[in-house]
Regions:
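Short alpha-helix
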Residues: 215-239
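Conserved beta-strand signature within the Rossmann-like core of class I S-adenosyl-L-methionine
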Residues: 125, 151-155, 171-192
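Short "lid" loop at the C-terminus of a central beta-strand within the Rossmann-like core
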Residues: 130, 159-161, 190-194
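Rossmann-like AdoMet
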Residues: 1-127, 131-145, 262
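Short SAM/SAH-binding signature in class I
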Residues: 145-159
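Core SAM-dependent methyltransferase catalytic element
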Residues: 238, 245-271
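A short, conserved alpha-helix within the catalytic core of class I
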Residues: 132-137, 161-174
Length: 271
């Protein structure tokens, strides 16, 4: 997740990465995080399930990429590498798969380094995903990834922090241009396009409830998400609701929640 430059290690201050960990049933969260998460869930009861849909999409898209021969991953705005994250899925299929987690937020980086200690093929890097030139020059990225080979780029829940004034299409192009042909980019995004009126009100109340923890959340429709994949070939079924993107036995989570309609997901191939 991308967060404000003022973020710090104060355990009394709710933290976006730890809140997300709490939604996923992880153990790396504190009372302040759980308290804010409870407030957020009170205005959007489907928030926890939405987080689980997002993680389910990440797991399925990583599995898909490994099946296509991808052996190295860049997970942007990753938060904490817990609860069935990229390295766990990739390395279960290919023990030699390499993963670089990137987050700007120092809490996520500090905890992530502890979690990944002892794993020679996974590292945590402190960098801002909105600055790809700096990110790709980071020694942690350069030391782990071979940018001349195809790469799996994970952008699950990242572009929701990038407003139109920050040129999200241009940002996606910057990543696409660095990726070797045969690379894949997975992206998920918050939406209220298919929500009923009551749920739309809840979504915008949730956006307000997150203020003070993050800078801003942005909601996009399907056309807005499709535009982010300009210049790439969308993998079937294209842009779809998160739980509907290529469900796989053992990697799915139940549907039926109002949150089913609150996130789009897609994977694009770099040709």
């Amino acid at each position: 997740m991308l967060v404000s430059e003022t973020a710090h290690l104060d355990p009394e201050t709710p933290n976006i990465s730890r809140i997300y960990d709490y939604y996923l049933g992880g153990a790396f969260n504190l009372p302040a995080d759980r308290e804010r998460a409870t407030v957020i869930k009170s205005v959007l009861p489907g928030m926890e399930m939405l987080a689980r849909f997002n993680r389910g999409f990440l797991r399925r898209s990583v599995a898909f990429m490994v099946d296509q021969g991808i052996t190295q991953f860049l997970d942007l705005g990753s938060g904490l590498p817990t609860a069935g994250n990229t390295h766990e899925v990739a390395q279960a299929r290919d023990p030699h798969a390499k993963v670089v987690y990137v987050d700007y937020e120092p809490v996520a980086v500090a905890l992530g380094e502890q979690i990944l200690r002892g794993n020679p093929n996974a590292v945590m890097v402190e960098a801002d995903a909105r600055r790809p030139d700096e990110l790709f020059g980071h020694p942690g990225v350069r030391g782990m990834l071979d940018l001349d080979r195809p790469l799996g780029v994970m952008m699950t829940g990242v572009m929701v922090f990038v407003g139109d004034h920050e040129d999200p299409v241009g940002l996606m192009k910057a990543y696409r241009d660095v990726c070797a042909p045969g690379s894949y980019i997975a992206l998920s995004h918050l939406t209220d396009e298919r929500a009923d009126p009551e749920t739309k009100v809840q979504v915008h109340a949730m956006v307000e409830a997150y203020k003070g923890v993050i800078e801003q959340l942005y909601v996009r429709d399907r056309a807005g998400v499709e535009a982010l994949f300009d210049g790439m070939t969308l993998v079937e079924p294209g842009v779809t609701l998160m739980p509907e993107w290529n469900p796989r036995p053992g990697l799915d989570i139940p549907t039926g929640s109002p949150a089913h309609h609150l996130g789009y997901a897609a994977v694009g191939r770099v040709d």
